[in-house]
Amino acid sequence: MPRKSSRLTFAVLATGAGVFSMLQSLIAPALPTVQHALHTSQSTATWVMTAYLLSASVFTPILGRVGDLVGKKRTLVAVLLAVLAGCLVAALAPNIGVLIIARVVQGIGGALFPLSFGIIRDEFDASRVPGSISNLSAVIAAGGGVGMVAAGPIVTALDYRWLFWFPVAIVAVTTLIAVRYVPESPSRADGRVNWLGAVLLSGWLVALLLPLSQAGTWGWGSVRVVGLFSAAVVLFAAWLLSEARSSSPLIDLKVMRLPSVWTTNTAALLFGAGMYAIWSFLPGFVQTPSSAGYGFGASVTASGLLMLPMLLAMFVSGVLSGRLEPVVGAKTLLTTGAALGAIACAILALWHDQQWQIALVAGIFGLGIGLAFASMANLIVGSVPPEQTGAATGMNANIRTIGGSIGAAVTSVLVTGRLQPSGLPYGSGYTHGFTLLAVLLLGAALAALMVPRRSGRGGGKTVGGSGSVLLKAEEEASVMAPGALN
């Protein structure tokens, strides 16, 4: 692809993925405003986040696979139209029920991540693939930061509905440009969609993530939580059996068993647990009145500004990782990113009584997120055959989301386990929560050390047709100890 065309294609992909990532975090700081404006309860308002999470978890791997089969551009345009429709309905929603449905439709946009990675792999010169994936990952990571920072000023100056009107305009233009300029992928997977596998995958994901997100309201020992967890186990086993027997599996389990894939996914699970929990709880910590013995009583806007170093660091480190990856390898970058996250949480557990400490921690964590996002994507893309790119990267994103749900749920138990007479958590709850996140992120760094070195350096060398060669080599290597290739 000519450089000018590839730049335009990248701009389209980055804009779409960035908007979706922004939508993921944009509404969280505004939930109290939404609750008041739509005259609903806090427990109902949280479904605005839960519905989005569940929808994205279901559609990301399924539509990633559909893109591999029927064409990534065609699927990309359809997904962009879904996001556009979801944002438009959300901006006009007259009640909380319609807003929740709109968020379900927006969640379809989770497939933009695997589709974008697949288009880059199919269309860009092999030498430019790792850097482009790193840059796209930087935009995705920064998009979440933009959401946290921008929500307060938008709601204060305008109205919460503008959190959706702005994306409507951006996605509409992006869709038109995508139709005109993004090329259709030349690489197609053989077979069909395993719809039974898709239904079972959707079933166990919902049965797992729903109780994780609602256990604080329902109670961990409630019939609903225990029943859904039990259903998740049964449906997961049925899904594995269906995929193993299918001639055209939704997720190729052979690919998932590759040493470079399962170790990267393990790191993604643990890193996601730490990252999403920090995004969920650090703003609340900062906004807590200082009368609680901690916190700064910051407004939504002020807390967003304290997160600004994280946003800037995420983008800078994500872009720089594209230049560092051919030199030090994606494995080293992933290990470093997870270690930086662990250091940030350890600092936060020990020192959090000054605002500059929060800003410092946010910056360190942002550096880690930028490095980790880019390296995880490069490791997966460089380890699987071209026709499996969408499904494999979609599953990696899903595993990161599952980790985030687990991390947020466990941290919530620690933070809210004991409450002051005012109803606010004790500071020790946050300290214990931040300590746990440091341990989880340290685990992510250790998992990253297990990634086979051959796929950790020069990820661009494995793209294109050589993915099947690497697949065969790693299938043979998988019978050895995971560390044998380090």
Stretches found by the model and what they are:
Residues A37-H39, G71, L92-G97, L158-D159, ...:
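Helix-breaking motifs and short loop linkers at transmembrane-helix boundaries and internal kinks
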Residues R74-V89, V168, T332-A346:
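Structural signature of the two symmetry-related core transmembrane helices
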